């Protein structure tokens, strides 16, 4: 990875942004979709605008709300705790979720549903209890619990779970968004990180090229899109002026991802504020 050349205007913007630099500690309680979103490019994107992130990912592949809750209650050591500090990643196997939660005074902790269930409202029945237990364990009294709104599968997906949505990307996308809109207010989660909306908007401009397999994001373009979304959400700074991107993403694609990210942030705010 490298940072692209900066114009005088870009340098002026960076100086201005640097005056408002932030240090933010964020923990994702997730699965492979949080791995796609926070473990690649996010730290570098924030650093490019003068911000510092401590990033944690409580990882179990395919983990659902119910399994996270059960793990928290029983103390199972099923997690890989991936942590990025100063741009360096560590991976601690056989970790407990309660230990991960108290590892740092996290400013933001995100929750998410396993992708097959992400658009199924009945699968959210234990979200309130999970949120309560996480919040009680958190050592930062001002921690904010947020939701990671994930993406629909590519239209060509052969995943068996896709059949629950009629093997339709549009149907799955709408189900994910509508489920978040209906279920999150019930448990007091007010804000979403709209990775799934960014991915869907990017598909409109770039085609259905955001995935590397039947469900996961592509290693460069897709993961970059999710990381841009997290960066703008966490820092509150427009991604449009960010000067970092992976070498294997073209300048045109960067512009489209930036546009999709910025639009997704506005769109999710309207969705969450709309009458239910």
Predicted regions and their residues:
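Bacterial N-terminal signal peptides that target proteins for export
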Residues: 1-7
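Hydrophobic h-region of N-terminal signal peptides that target proteins for export
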Residues: 12-19
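Extreme N-terminal starter segment of soluble prokaryotic enzymes
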Residues: 22-25
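Conserved SGNH/GDSL esterase-like catalytic core that processes O-acyl groups on lipids
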Residues: 36-124
């Amino acid at each position: 990875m490298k940072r692209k050349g900066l114009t005088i205007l870009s340098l002026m913007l960076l100086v201005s942004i640097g005056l408002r630099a932030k240090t933010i500690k964020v923990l994702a309680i997730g699965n492979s979709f949080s791995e796609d979103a926070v473990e690649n490019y996010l730290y570098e994107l924030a650093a490019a605008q003068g911000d510092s992130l401590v990033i944690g990912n409580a990882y179990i592949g395919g983990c659902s709300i119910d399994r996270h809750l059960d793990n928290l209650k029983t103390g199972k050591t099923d997690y890989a705790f991936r942590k990025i500090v100063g741009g360096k990643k560590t991976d601690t196997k056989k970790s407990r979720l309660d230990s991960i939660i108290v590892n740092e005074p996290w400013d933001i902790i995100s929750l998410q549903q396993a992708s097959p269930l992400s658009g199924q409202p009945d699968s959210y029945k234990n979200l309130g209890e999970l949120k309560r237990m996480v919040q009680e364990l958190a050592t930062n009294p001002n921690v904010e619990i947020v939701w990671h709104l994930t993406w629909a599968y590519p239209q060509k997906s052969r995943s068996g779970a896709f059949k629950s949505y009629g093997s339709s990307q549009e149907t799955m996308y709408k189900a994910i968004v509508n489920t978040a809109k209906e279920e999150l207010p019930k448990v007091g989660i007010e804000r979403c990180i709209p990775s799934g909306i960014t991915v869907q908007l990017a598909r409109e401009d770039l085609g259905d090229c955001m995935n590397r397999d039947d469900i996961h994001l592509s290693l460069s373009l897709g993961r970059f899109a999710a990381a841009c979304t997290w960066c703008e959400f966490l820092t509150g700074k427009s991604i449009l002026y960010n000067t970092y991107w992976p070498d294997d993403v073209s300048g045109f694609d960067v512009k489209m991802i930036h546009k999709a990210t910025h639009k997704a942030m506005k769109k999710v705010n309207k969705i969450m504020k709309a009458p239910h």
